[in-house]
């Protein structure tokens, strides 16, 4: 057994409420993802919702992270079993599921990652995740080593946060601050007091159910505040944001 895969160290860290500092990968490039993997982050989101990623771009990025201590987390474009199955088969063990609003939707996400009888994952005997059939106990280990993080980013999701957090198999609750702000009537202003109060409420309810909570916070002051509020896995920036800021600074240094 490949000990870098099983047990799932990121899943264990969430269960232990250990602080995990991460980064967002949106450039869909194996080179930039490899650089992120060398930086020392605990986890990396490879974004399949808002970034131009699919199976063919994600496989090279997973290859680029081989040997990295950073746990790859895929954000799928939608909570759909076939999409999730394909991400499982190419080698993802950690999932961020966007726009979860009910306990039923959370349970469906969990079921999509589990083989029967615990779930509905389709069975392939040879794929990248089981090293093309060379991992003898893959089926026995897989169900126990998948991480499910559900994203709350709507008023309905906030209303159902207790039921969602209590769902068996859900490892963490993640706040989508931009969509949440829009849902609360503050498009483009995640710093609005209403949004901040709601974020703190989501964190508190997740913690009450023993679940880790996380968020994307590219502004340092925001990230530190969320950590103080009890967030345990925080993405503190993105490859796109870092690249844009550094190149703009470089240009400004010589052009202004």
From Swiss-Prot:
Pfam families: HpcH_HpaI. Gene3D superfamilies: Phosphoenolpyruvate-binding domains. GO terms for biological process: D-glucarate catabolic process; galactarate catabolic process. HAMAP family: KDGluc_aldolase. This is 5-keto-4-deoxy-D-glucarate aldolase. One of its GO terms (cellular component) is cytoplasm. Homohexamer; trimer of dimers. The record marks 75 as: Transition state stabilizer. Binds 1 Mg(2+) ion per subunit. GO terms for molecular function: 2-dehydro-3-deoxyglucarate aldolase activity; magnesium ion binding. The gene is garL. It is an enzyme of class 4 (lyase). Catalyzes the reversible retro-aldol cleavage of both 5-keto-4-deoxy-D-glucarate and 2-keto-3-deoxy-D-glucarate to pyruvate and tartronic semialdehyde. Mg(2+) binds at residues 153, 179.
């Amino acid at each position: 057994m490949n000990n870098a895969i099983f047990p799932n160290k990121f899943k264990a860290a969430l269960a232990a409420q250990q602080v995990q500092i991460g980064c967002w990968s949106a450039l869909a490039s194996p080179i930039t993802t490899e650089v992120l993997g060398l930086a020392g982050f605990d986890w990396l989101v490879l974004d399949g919702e808002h970034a131009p990623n699919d199976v063919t771009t994600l496989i090279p990025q997973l290859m680029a992270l081989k040997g990295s201590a950073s746990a790859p987390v895929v954000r799928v474009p939608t909570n759909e079993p076939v999409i999730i199955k394909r991400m499982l088969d190419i080698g993802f063990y950690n999932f961020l599921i966007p726009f979860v609003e009910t306990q039923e939707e959370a349970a469906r996400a969990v079921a999509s990652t589990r083989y029967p009888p615990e779930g509905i994952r389709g069975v392939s005997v040879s794929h990248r995740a089981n090293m093309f059939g060379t991992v003898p106990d893959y089926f026995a280990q897989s169900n126990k080593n998948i991480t499910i993080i559900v994203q709350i980013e709507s008023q309905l999701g906030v209303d159902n946060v207790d039921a969602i957090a209590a769902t068996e198999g859900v490892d963490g609750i993640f706040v989508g601050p931009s969509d949440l702000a829009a849902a609360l009537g503050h498009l483009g202003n995640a710093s609005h007091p209403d949004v901040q109060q709601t974020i703190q409420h989501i964190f508190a309810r997740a913690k009450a159910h023993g679940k880790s909570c996380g968020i994307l916070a590219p502004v340092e002051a925001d990230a530190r505040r969320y950590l103080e509020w009890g967030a345990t896995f925080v993405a503190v920036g993105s490859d796109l944001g870092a690249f844009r800021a550094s190149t703009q600074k470089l240009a400004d240094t010589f052009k202004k």
